[in-house]
Amino acid sequence: MISLRHFTTFLLRSSRSVGLMLMLFLTCSLVSCDKLPRNGKLDGHWQLMELNGTSVRHEGTYWSFQLDLLQLKSLTHSPITEVQYSGGVVARFEHRGDSLILTKGYLMNRDYQQDILIDSTHQADLTAYGITEFPMRYRVLLLTDEELTLIADHHRLVFRKF
């Protein structure tokens, strides 16, 4: 039979182990929190379905939001630019309430490990994506788990969650 002293020692060691495991788990959880979704329903992949009242669903234009980065893709369009780049467009954005601001856009130049800021020196026409300038300010008219509608000046963009 086990003595009370041995049993008490066993319990103390076990509770220390459980406490250490719990502390390790909480530390790991807190450290990794900065990569969790922070844009609510906006995070994820969206397909542009309608641009200014015209259906563009078959053009395969996509906006993907994560953290503060927006990736733009199109199966049928490329940015119109004279800048040499390896492909792809990304933008930094801010989302607060019913406001979405695309603050800066970049042409991805992965061949040289440096993205190119879209500005007056390095211009790119992104109208096929629904973007006419940077910064680009949209009002979020509708945002659900399935649909997103943005308004900017005379532009209306309707997306579906993909």
In which residue ranges do the predicted regions lie?
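Sec-dependent N-terminal signal peptides
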Residues: 20-26
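Contiguous, well-ordered beta-strand patches that form the walls/edges
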Residues: 51-60, 72-143
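Bacterial N-terminal signal peptides that target proteins for export
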Residues: 3-20
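Bacterial signal peptide processing site
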Residues: 34-36
